Every structure is written in structure tokens, then in C-alpha cells.
């Protein structure tokens, strides 16, 4: 089954992202208000949970004054929370229990992520093609500094060896995103490998040294670990690019890396 991807929507969103990047504070604030109004209208109409949760609260009430919700409350009423009645928590749990389905489209049109449950409540998150287009556009246009000479000559990373270092084996956002990327770009299936952070550090270092990636994607905490290994001479390669996500990258951590 093909991964969730709409090239026309991606093109449209990319143009919108570029336009927003040139907008002033007033225009951005107006855009935010309009989008929030559409979002509230949609969830009140299509989500039973939010229709009850926001009952009696008019659209003029500011976002900061809306009653908050918790992940526990949302997951407890998942089937009422979603806006598509075809989405059912029991079915989604069966889908995320299948490791062979990582990165595959659910019902032919959704990307599904799960959280590890570090807050004692695992979450299930469903993304449609419109959402993925926004993620893809932001990743492509705002993730990094302006393109270097290397990237202009190789925008598809054909000459690179890419490595994702993270938690594997589940439908976690980063792992699903990497698998989806591989499916969308077949040339990356051999040049983009994944390495589990749950293995002993010595084994991870040995595996990375054997592969010698030129680009590493990982979490800031893992990037610090790898930087420390490089500092003591254990890593025998020097990547040209390091991508981080999933956690906040503070200035002190950035300097250390």
C-alpha cells in the first residue's frame, strides 16, 4: 500500500509557507485567528467529545480561556474524540501492534503514530494527507539554514549515507517518518539505515563506525551521547550534517554537540 502523500497539496502548502515567511506580525496574527476559528468550528461539528467539552462556549472566547484537556481524558474517549467515525481505538491498537505496518497507510489515507507512554498514558495520533503536507513543507523549507553548495548539487541526498538513531520497533513518530520517507524515495532504502538506541552504546558505536554515515538524524540527548563518544575518539567518522528532533535543543546542548 502506498504511503500517505499528496504532491499537489504539498505544493500548495509549500507556497503558503513561503508566503507566510514574508508576512508581518499583523498578517500572521490574522492567519492564526482564521485557522483557529476553522479548527474550532470543525471539532465542534465533527467530534462528540469536543462538542460536549466546549458546549456553551462561543467562538469569541480566546484560546487561552478554553477549558484544557489531558491525554488521559482524550484517550479514554478516543472514539468520541476523533472526527472520522471510521477511526476506532481498538482497530488502531491492532494496527500499531503490527511491526510490518510501520510507515504504511491506515485505511489507505492515514499515518498513525503512537507514543511510548512515558506519562503513564500511551497516545495514538492519526494524521491525514493535509497534515503530512504541512509537516513535509515545514521540514523542507524551515528545518535548516540555506542550502549549501553540496545540497544544491545533491538535493536528493543521493551521495549521502544517512542514519537514524532512535527507538525502533514501534509506531513512534520518528520511526514511522523514516519508514515513510524510505517508501516515498526508493533510492533511500539502502542509503538510509536505522540504529536502535536501546542497544549497548559500544554496539551502537561499532555499528555506526561500520556504516560511517555522512548524515545523522536523532534526538538531542542521543546527539550529546554521540558527541561524547566522538570526543573520546570512539567514533571513527565525521558526519557532514546532524539533524535533531523530538526534544528541545537548547543552546548549551547545541554548543556541546
Where in the sequence are the language-model features?
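Conserved adenylate-forming
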Residues: 38, 45, 167-257
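Nucleotide 5′-phosphate-binding alpha/beta core
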Residues: 1-114, 120-160, 210-217, 236-237, ...
Amino acid at each position: 500500500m502506498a504511503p500517505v502523500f499528496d504532491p499537489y497539496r504539498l505544493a500548495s502548502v509549500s507556497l503558503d509557507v513561503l508566503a507566510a515567511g514574508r508576512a508581518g506580525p499583523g498578517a500572521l496574527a490574522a492567519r492564526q485567528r482564521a485557522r483557529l476559528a476553522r479548527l474550532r468550528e470543525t471539532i465542534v461539528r465533527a467530534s462528540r467529545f469536543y462538542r460536549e467539552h466546549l458546549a456553551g462556549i462561543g467562538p469569541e472566547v480566546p484560546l487561552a480561556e478554553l477549558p484544557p484537556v489531558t491525554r488521559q481524558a482524550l484517550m479514554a474517549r478516543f472514539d468520541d474524540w476523533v472526527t472520522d467515525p471510521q477511526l476506532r481505538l481498538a482497530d488502531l491498537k491492532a494496527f500499531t501492534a503490527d511491526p510490518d505496518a510501520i510507515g504504511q497507510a491506515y485505511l489507505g489515507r492515514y499515518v498513525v503514530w503512537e507514543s511510548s507512554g512515558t506519562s503513564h498514558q500511551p497516545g495514538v495520533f492519526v494524521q491525514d494527507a493535509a497534515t503530512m503536507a504541512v509537516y513535509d513543507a515545514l521540514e523542507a523549507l524551515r528545518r535548516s539554514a540555506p542550502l549549501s553548495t553540496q545540497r544544491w548539487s545533491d538535493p536528493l541526498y543521493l551521495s549521502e549515507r544517512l542514519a537514524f538513531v532512535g527507538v525502533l520497533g514501534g509506531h513512534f513518530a520518528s520511526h514511522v517518518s523514516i519508514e515513510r520517507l524510505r517508501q516515498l524515495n526508493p533510492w533511500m532504502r539502502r542509503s538510509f539505515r536505522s540504529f536502535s538506541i536501546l542497544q549497548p552504546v559500544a554496539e551502537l558505536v561499532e555499528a555506526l563506525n561500520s556504516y560511517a554515515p555522512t548524515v545523522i538524524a536523532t534526538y538531542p540527548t542521543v546527539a550529546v551521547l554521540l558527541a561524547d563518544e566522538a570526543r573520546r575518539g570512539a567514533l571513527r567518522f565525521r558526519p557532514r550534517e546532524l539533524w535533531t528532533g523530538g526534544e528541545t535543543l537548547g543552546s548549551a546542548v547545541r554548543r556541546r554537540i
